[in-house]
Structure formats: structure tokens, C-alpha cells
Curated annotation (Swiss-Prot):
It comes from Escherichia fergusonii (strain ATCC 35469 / DSM 13698 / CCUG 18766 / IAM 14443 / JCM 21226 / LMG 7866 / NBRC 102419 / NCTC 12128 / CDC 0568-73). This is Protein SprT. The active site is at E79. Binds 1 zinc ion. It holds the Pfam family SprT-like. PROSITE patterns: ZINC_PROTEASE (PS00142). The gene is sprT.
Length: 165
């Protein structure tokens, strides 16, 4: 499913969640942070990104369509938290203690750094790599970094260096 045409009902649900969490944050923080710009232009395997300087949230329309409920519940507050942390604290670690606090204490959402959505429809070419416990699929970018000797990747489970299959 490569379409970026989103049903209006899904766009409205995204906006409701954004407004709800922004109002909640403004109330708890005693601030009046503005509504960020929202676009559906994120591509690839990222569910969303927060652009600090332009105060914008970019969401992946394909992943949103395929995972609407979980996406709206998790990704929208996740990206909003990045913008609120930037407004409230300035430049800090992207998923540091300030972001975790904003997610859990202010927005009331579990602080997860990554999504668990199925990526088959948005994944492009991948390259098989192995460790001692499983097979991994590296993106073209990561594969090229390995080939050029710029990066080494390790399995998060066993810690072994990944090798091309």
C-alpha cells in the first residue's frame, strides 16, 4: 500500500489526539505552547519525525493507514513530546530524561523510543546479515556503511557483530 491519500476521518483523529495532548501539556506545564504544523510527508520506515526549528511534525501516511489506532495513540504524542521538550528545555538528548518525563508525567503515554509496526510495505531493498542468534535485514544505507568500513552493527540480543550472509 504505497498511497499517501489519507481518509479525512483518520486525519481528524490525528488532529484530535494532537489537540488533546497539547491541551493536556499546556495545562500541566502552565504554558500556552502553539499547535505545531502537521504534514504527512515522512517516508521510509520512520513513523514520524519532529522538526524543531520549523516546529513541525511529519507523519508517515503509509504506516498511519496500516496501523491507525496504535499510530495515533503512540506516534502523535511521541513526536509532540519532542517539540514540547525543545520549547520547554531547549536542545537536549532526543530520548533523554526530559523527553521520558514529558511522555510519561505530562502526556501520560508510555515512553517508547521505537514503534513495532510491520514494515514490509515501506521497506525498500534490504541486505541479509547474521549473528549467532538470528538473521537481520540491513537497509541500503547501513549496508553501504559496512561496505565502506564506516560502521559496524551488533545484535541487540546477543551482542555479536553482524556479518553479511
Amino acid at each position: 500500500m504505497k498511497t499517501s491519500r489519507l481518509p479525512i476521518a483518520i486525519q481528524q483523529a490525528v488532529m484530535r489526539r494532537l489537540w488533546e495532548k497539547l491541551a493536556q501539556a499546556n495545562l500541566k506545564l502552565g504554558r500556552n505552547y502553539p499547535e505545531p504544523k502537521l504534514s504527512y510527508t515522512q517516508r521510509g520506515t520512520s513513523a514520524g519525525t519532529a522538526w524543531l526549528e520549523s516546529y513541525e511534525i511529519r507523519l508517515n501516511p503509509v504506516l498511519l493507514l496500516e496501523n491507525s489506532e496504535a499510530f495515533i495513540e503512540e506516534v502523535v504524542p511521541h513526536e509532540l513530546a519532542h517539540l514540547l521538550v525543545w520549547k520547554h528545555f531547549g536542545r537536549v538528548a532526543p530520548h533523554g530524561k526530559e523527553w521520558k518525563w514529558m511522555m510519561e508525567s505530562v502526556l501520560g503515554v508510555p515512553a517508547r523510543r521505537t514503534h513495532q509496526f510491520e514494515l514490509q510495505s515501506v521497506r525498500r531493498n534490504t541486505f541479509p546479515y547474521r549473528c549467532k542468534c538470528q538473521e537481520h535485514q540491513l537497509t541500503v544505507r547501513r549496508h553501504n556503511r559496512v561496505v565502506r568500513g564506516e560502521a559496524v552493527y551488533r545484535c541487540v540480543h546477543c551482542g555479536e557483530q553482524l556479518t553479511a550472509k
